[in-house]
Amino acid sequence: MTAEQRAGLSDAALAMTQPCIDELIKDISKRVQKAGAITDTAEYQIYRAQALGEGKKAIEQAVSKQIGISEEVIASLFEYVADKSLSPDENGSLKRMTEAYTRMTQSKTRELLRDLWADTPEGKVQPLQTAYARAMDFAFRQVATGTLDLNTAIRRAVTPLAKRGLRTIEQKSGRSVGIEYACRRYIMDQLGQLDDEIQHADHDALGCDGWEISAHAACAPDHEPIQGRQYGDAEFEKLNNSLQRRIGHLNCGHTANPIILGVNAPQYTEAQLQKFKDDNERGVVYNGYRYTLYEAGQEQSRIENGIRLIKRQILADEETENPDLQKHQIKLRVVQAEYARFCKAVGLPTRSERLQVAGFGRSQSNRAVWAYKKAAPEQLRDVEIAGHKLYSVTDERIRAVPKPFFQGVSNK
């Protein structure tokens, strides 16, 4: 697979779980809002039992629907890799291997989706149903005791969920990670494993004795010294085992192609590899800060993630009638305009497919534009996203942002 093909597969794997996450966040936010409006303890206990029962059913239905979607997506991703790697007349062993990888990945993804966790208002990560109950209890308790007003209590109960999304627990480290990133990482790792298996089969069938690592611009620092190089079998295996990120795994855009040493000439000259390195190091300057080309790509991804988080927050705000809705709508337009400005300045294409959130359509986008236009100047101050300051923008920059076209997520 090429770096471009890997990037496309990675985007598809990341987007796969978005509908489930966004649907559940909206559902939970709506129920927390109702819980906060109840002041009688007995009435709340009745509502709590009913809401948790309905919520559990909603979670099960959303996850079940998502599993069906995910299994179709996973099958299509593995078919894509096989189609790019196998000729029609290949024997059935590699095709059977592709089917086995597909089944294994579908099974693991089902496990991940059935083990959802979320942040509670107290800052702890709990199983989703428990976190759901904690959020409702928090909103009710704070309002009933007069500790917080209704809007503040609901905002504090819902914000951790909207900000951090649905999560899963890594078995090795015990850390919680976003479910969409956990699924993407696992799927891409399995796709990489399948590609490795196919390449090794080609290696043996052709009588090869070495490997050549592909090369691309804007390379990560840990792989830049080795890209474009040829290695004997033993040398390559030793090198790959020494890497924290093996070739073709963990968001690596490289591939290792089988070669016959001394027969297959390198695909890249030393001058071409040096130009990749020099261009990356020279990088770009934006707002007085120098980025390598690789760092610019990472910054672009951080802003894209920030935009998705703000959109989720807006959807939760709408369900809970949060008075901060306008503030978040303004923030969205500021960050969207900054995204367009950053990409144009550093020479990167905007990636609208990475900004999509299920349920956030044209109406939400238009309301965000209107809120921005009505905002007083003091509301258009600088904002921070993902730990980075983004600067307020002008009407000209807002007009430069392409009109959102996304109205939903297709299951096709």
Model segments located where?
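Noncatalytic linker/hinge segments flanking ATPase motor cores
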Residues: 159, 255, 263, 296-303
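Contiguous, non-catalytic segments that form substrate-binding/exosite surfaces or channel walls
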Residues: 114-206
